[in-house]
Structures are given as C-alpha cells and as structure tokens.
C-alpha cells in the first residue's frame, strides 16, 4: 500500500510511524487509519513502534470535513469509519506483539487522544494537551476512550474529561497519571526516540 497520510521509516529495530498532515494539525481521515493498520502488519522484524505527528501537533482528531468520510449520510459514514477503520486500528495496536511509544506535542484530541494513550508509553512535551471534545459536538468518545480513560485516570477524572470537554494540559495529565514525566518540547522526540530502541533491545522469550 502506498501511504498518503503517514510516513513509515525504520530506525534500527524501531518502526517510526508519523502522521503526516501538518497543515491540518494531523487531523485524521479514515484512510489514515487504514494506512496505520497496514504499516503495523509490516513490522519486518521491528521490535518497537514509535508513533508521532509531523509539525506542531500529534493529532487534532478525526478529519470529517470536506467529504473525508465519503458519504452523503454523516451518521452512517461515521459509524462505518468507526467500525471499519478507527476501532480496528486501536485493536491492532492493543494486540501488537511489540511495545508502542507515542510522542505527543500540541493537541492529542478526540481519536488522536485515544491513539496517543493506546500506546504502551506516552511521552508528552510541555506543549501537549489531551482533549475529549465530543460533548461539544453531540457525539460520544471514540477509539476506546470510554474504556481506556477510566482505567488510566479513574472514573471521576475520566468523566471530567468527557463531560466537560476541556483541555487537559500535559502537567495536569501527568498529575493524573496519564503519561510518564513531561519533557521539554525540544527533548520530546529525543526521549521518545530513545525509549523505542531501549524497548527494542530488551530481551524476549524465545
């Protein structure tokens, strides 16, 4: 598969997958998740995966405008995207046999929040924030967020995120236990990149 929305690059034993729509803050059309899922089936011996976003954002959420869903009925198209593309990709990450590290700067919103937190490790810069804004547009959290968030940060804090639809800055997310220690923006990629090889070099069961 030729990739239009992501970059896939091997760095030693680490497969680096970069959401590559910086002009849209890496807003993710359904096809992007097809590409991610395809890339995850092509580890070719990689022992860790690093997820990142090009530019100043990790992922600003699903791109549902401009015909991205490709259907006249938004409800049916959204359901199809969730069941055929978004959710299967989240399950593919959960079932992957190697560690996944996400490197977050700027927004990790909506499905982008779920994608970041689905990783085994989430490295967040000082500019990062996490957002569940579905309540503001009359939708429910997607990408497994309603299952994942209560288990990461507890029911009350998950409810606060999902019912208020407010940004959770990196420092607050750290206090809540959502991710490892915050790092400076310029160090985010270095730390995330270092974690990938470290996990890749760890021993495995024969």
Outline where the language-model segments fall:
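Conserved CoA-thioester-binding segment of acyl-CoA-metabolizing enzymes
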Residues: 1-54, 91
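Hydrophobic/aromatic residues within transmembrane alpha-helices
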Residues: 17, 51, 63, 115-117, ...
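Histidine-centered beta-alpha loop that forms part of the nucleotide-sugar donor binding/catalytic region
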Residues: 20, 62, 105
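Hydrophobic alpha-helical membrane-association signature
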Residues: 32-35, 82-85, 188
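Glycine- (often His-adjacent) and acidic-residue-rich active-site loop
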Residues: 45, 53-92, 108
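Crotonase-fold acyl-CoA enzyme core
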Residues: 91-205
């Amino acid at each position: 598969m030729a990739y239009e929305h992501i970059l896939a690059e091997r760095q030693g034993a680490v497969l680096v997958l970069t959401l590559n729509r910086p002009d849209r803050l890496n807003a993710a059309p359904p096809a992007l998740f097809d590409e991610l899922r395809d890339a995850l089936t092509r580890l070719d011996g990689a022992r860790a995966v690093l997820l990142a976003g090009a530019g100043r954002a990790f992922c600003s959420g699903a791109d549902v405008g401009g015909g991205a869903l490709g259907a006249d009925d938004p409800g049916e198209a959204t359901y199809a995207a969730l069941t055929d593309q978004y959710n299967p990709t989240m399950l593919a990450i959960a079932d992957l046999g190697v560690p996944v590290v996400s490197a977050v700067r700027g927004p990790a919103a909506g499905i982008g929040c779920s994608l970041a937190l689905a990783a085994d490790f989430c490295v967040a810069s000082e500019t990062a924030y996490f957002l569940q804004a579905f309540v503001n547009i009359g939708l429910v959290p997607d990408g497994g967020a309603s299952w994942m968030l209560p288990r990461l940060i507890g029911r009350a804090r998950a409810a606060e995120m999902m019912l208020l639809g407010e940004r959770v800055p990196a420092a607050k997310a750290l206090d809540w236990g959502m991710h490892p220690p915050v790092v400076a923006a310029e160090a985010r990629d270095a730390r995330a990149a270092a974690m990938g090889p470290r996990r890749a070099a760890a021993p495995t069961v024969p």
